């Protein structure tokens, strides 16, 4: 079991970014595979209502997990900067404090989410025929928040050190375990949506354990007891980086919940169609997320090393690769998307036709405008790597305002199809803000003295 840290302050920027991102993308293919397997098994074995029940909880899951993802991603920014600067004592302290803060926050998030879930589902007008199943699914997922938080912080620290191979292995192991447990719990034991939720949490536990074992082998972050107590102010620095990203994800999630509120009013078949497409959304967004992780690590390490010209070169290379990748994925979804969507549904032929019509129309629109989402991830990640998490927070607010406005108003003017454009408009508003902000921020490093030769 290797440690595979990677110093990104020397070498070809484009090569470093792509070799860092590819293992993460491969890992996410497995992750999306088991997410899709969840949906396929539930949809095919249990039926359309169960599929709608899982889908009705999607944005609530995204909200809770987004808090932990944002916090841990923010923590990893400081870790990558200390690693790039070669400040080993500060690096160890940042890792130790990240563990403590993540554990405390996961307990708080667990308590709040379990207590609020039923009331939120009622507020969202979740269809009566699926609300009980949705609540069961969510309560089980939320019970696993500390496990999921552990995986997030362990994987975030590995990425900050330039190690993208170990998260790939962890996600691959989780995918295999999850699919196997899905088949056992849902298809054999007949546990329905509860079985799917339990399988997901157990699989995440295995991935967290693997990442922890890798971290324990890395000499630079072998923690001593005093690392957890030194520099109390370090916790505040971590929170200043992590909190805006968590709030950003909360704001984006609330916008998504507003969309879910509107969709719920269109009936459970519409919910099922949206659910099928949202499961493919992970594939659409997959490469963007991991180009983003690569760029955050790359920018953070080079900022710590004061190699500012490399930052500009790396972001430029990342932009080209991201746009080309988005065009390829869009073409694939347009060509074979409907066939993939058909794997998620079973039931009466007329129901299947309606669900697929809704799902493919939404998928087609997202595929056409996917390049905007990829630009959003590249520039948001670059800004985060520079240590600025307030501008990404502002972009989250822009997403929220646009997503909610379009979701509430456009369906009134052009009918149900108006809801399809909420995501596109949200991406566009955030991407414009982020690109302009990056151009302004990077200028201050233009004439700065660097450590580059």
Please place each PLM-identified region on the residue numbering:
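Short alpha-helical transmembrane segments in multi-pass integral membrane proteins
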Residues: 1-21, 79-144, 188-243, 299-368, ...
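Small-residue-rich hydrophobic transmembrane alpha-helices
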Residues: 51-111, 148-167, 273-337, 373-395
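Helix-terminus/linker motif at the lipid-water interface of multi-pass membrane proteins
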Residues: 29, 33-52, 121-128, 184-191, ...
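Transmembrane helical elements of multi-pass membrane transporters/channels
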Residues: 19-38, 140, 151, 174, ...
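N-terminal transmembrane alpha-helices
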Residues: 8-45, 59-74, 78, 103-110, ...
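Transmembrane alpha-helix boundary and packing residues in multipass membrane permease domains
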Residues: 24, 28, 40, 77, ...
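Hydrophobic transmembrane alpha-helices of multi-pass small-molecule transporters
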Residues: 63, 178-182, 208-212, 283-286, ...
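Short runs within selected transmembrane alpha-helices of multi-pass transporters and secretion channels
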Residues: 72, 140-159, 167-175, 196-209, ...
């Amino acid at each position: 079991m290797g440690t595979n840290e990677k110093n990104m302050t020397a070498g070809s920027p484009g090569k470093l970014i792509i070799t860092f991102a590819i293992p993460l993308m491969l890992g996410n293919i497995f992750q999306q595979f088991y997410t899709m397997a969840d949906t396929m098994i539930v949809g095919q074995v249990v039926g359309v209502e169960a599929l709608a029940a899982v889908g009705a909880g999607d944005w609530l899951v995204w909200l809770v997990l987004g808090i932990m993802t944002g916090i841990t991603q923010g923590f990893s920014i400081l870790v990558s900067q200390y690693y790039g600067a070669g400040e080993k004592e500060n690096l160890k302290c940042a890792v130790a404090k990240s563990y403590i803060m993540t554990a405390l926050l996961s307990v708080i998030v667990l308590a709040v989410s379990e207590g609020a879930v039923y009331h939120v589902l009622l507020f969202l007008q979740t269809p009566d025929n699926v609300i009980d199943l949705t609540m069961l699914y969510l309560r089980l997922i939320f019970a696993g928040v500390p496990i999921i938080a552990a995986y997030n912080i362990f994987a975030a620290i590995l990425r900050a050190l330039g190690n993208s191979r170990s998260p790939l292995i962890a996600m691959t192991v989780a995918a295999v375990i999850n699919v196997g447990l899905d088949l056992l719990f849902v298809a054999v034991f007949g546990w329905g949506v509860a079985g799917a939720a339990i399988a997901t949490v157990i699989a995440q536990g295995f991935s967290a354990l693997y990442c922890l074992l890798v971290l324990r082998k890395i000499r630079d972050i072998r923690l001593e007891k005093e690392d957890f107590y030194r520099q109390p102010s370090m916790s505040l620095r971590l929170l200043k980086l992590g909190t805006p990203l968590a709030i950003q994800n909360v704001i984006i999630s609330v916008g998504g919940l507003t969309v879910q509120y509107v969709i719920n009013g269109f009936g459970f078949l519409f919910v099922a169609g949206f659910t099928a497409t949202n499961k493919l959304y992970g594939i659409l967004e997959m490469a963007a997320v991991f180009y983003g992780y690569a760029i955050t690590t790359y920018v953070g390490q080079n900022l710590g090393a004061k190699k500012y010209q490399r930052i500009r070169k790396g972001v430029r290379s990342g932009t080209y690769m991201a746009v080309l990748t988005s065009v390829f994925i869009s073409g694939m979804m347009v060509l074979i998307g409907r066939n993939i969507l058909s794997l998620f549904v079973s039931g009466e032929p007329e129901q299947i036709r309606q669900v697929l019509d809704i799902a493919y129309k939404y998928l087609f629109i997202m595929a056409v405008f996917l390049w905007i989402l990829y630009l959003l991830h590249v520039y948001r990640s670059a800004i985060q790597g520079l240590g600025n998490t307030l501008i990404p927070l502002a972009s989250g607010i822009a997403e929220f305002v646009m997503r909610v406005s379009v979701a509430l108003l456009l369906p009134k003017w052009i009918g149900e199809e108006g809801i399809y454009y909420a995501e596109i408009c949200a991406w566009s508003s955030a991407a414009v803000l982020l690109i302009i902000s990056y151009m302004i921020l990077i200028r201050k490093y233009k004439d700065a003295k660097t450590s580059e030769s």
